[in-house]
Amino acid sequence: MKEIDIDTLISKIPNKYILTVVISRRARQLFEELKILKTVARDPLILAMEEVAQDKITYGEGSDSED
């Protein structure tokens, strides 16, 4: 498994608090998807961090879609 460098994540999303929220929300989404599919996969938290590091996840201020 490739190690995820925190500096890489911070370079993608400079605010550590926003970074934490983005990663945790994505990890929850992945967990729910895996639960529905009943798939055993890697840790959703690690997957979410990898997605941020690979620029697969972006965020925008004011784009909070929590209902």
From Swiss-Prot:
Biological processes per GO annotation: DNA-templated transcription
* Superkingdom of origin: Bacteria
Q: Keyword Nucleotidyltransferase on this protein?
A: yes
Q: What class of enzyme is it?
A: transferase
| Tagged with keyword ATP-binding | no
* UniProt keyword list: DNA-directed RNA polymerase, Nucleotidyltransferase, Transcription, Transferase
Give the GO molecular function terms: DNA binding; DNA-directed RNA polymerase activity
GO CC, one annotated term: DNA-directed RNA polymerase complex
Q: How does this polypeptide assemble, per the annotation?
A: The RNAP catalytic core consists of 2 alpha, 1 beta, 1 beta' and 1 omega subunit. When a sigma factor is associated with the core the holoenzyme is formed, which can initiate transcription.
Query: Main role?
Result: Promotes RNA polymerase assembly. Latches the N- and C-terminal regions of the beta' subunit thereby facilitating its interaction with the beta and alpha subunits.
Family, per entry: Belongs to the RNA polymerase subunit omega family.
For this protein, the record's HAMAP family field holds: RNApol_bact_RpoZ
Name the record gives this protein: DNA-directed RNA polymerase subunit omega
**Which species is this record about?**
Dictyoglomus thermophilum (strain ATCC 35947 / DSM 3960 / H-6-12)
